[in-house]
Amino acid sequence: VSMGRAFKVQTEAVRWSHDEAAFDAWREGRTGFPIVDAGMRQLLAEGWMHNRLRMITAMFLSKDLLIDWRWGERHFMRHLIDGDLASNNGGWQWSASTGTDAQPYFRVFNPTTQGKRFDPEGAFIRRFVPELEALDARRIHEPAAHGLFAPEEYPRPMVDHAAARD
């Protein structure tokens, strides 16, 4: 384990995006994907998030936005009250498919499906994304699909997950 270095050396050749505006949207919980936004806002508010959320948000940054996983690794270490080099680095490399026991590069969590599976009623999302608190369980995971918000109220999804996955 080495902070900022991929275990799989061949993955150092990946051309990561260095889109600071997209990184800021992810970091601040303004991606348009409610479960991602709730997790990132929890991190900023409490300095912690459940491991499932760490995987969802890390995979979203590295595989949906194609932003260098090291940016996320550093951000987590700055904010996690339980931040640990080995655990954090291993989690990021697992999510970005650059580590020893990494997910295959084609394994990408669907943030909408993950939200529906692990927060089916949307209680966690409502807690950290108050803009969505009035939505029922059917709509809270995909507010843009229901045409419920103007972008200044809650952002539209910043990427098309299906297209980003390909």
Region spans (language model):
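C-terminal catalytic domain of photolyase/cryptochrome flavoproteins
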Residues: 1-166
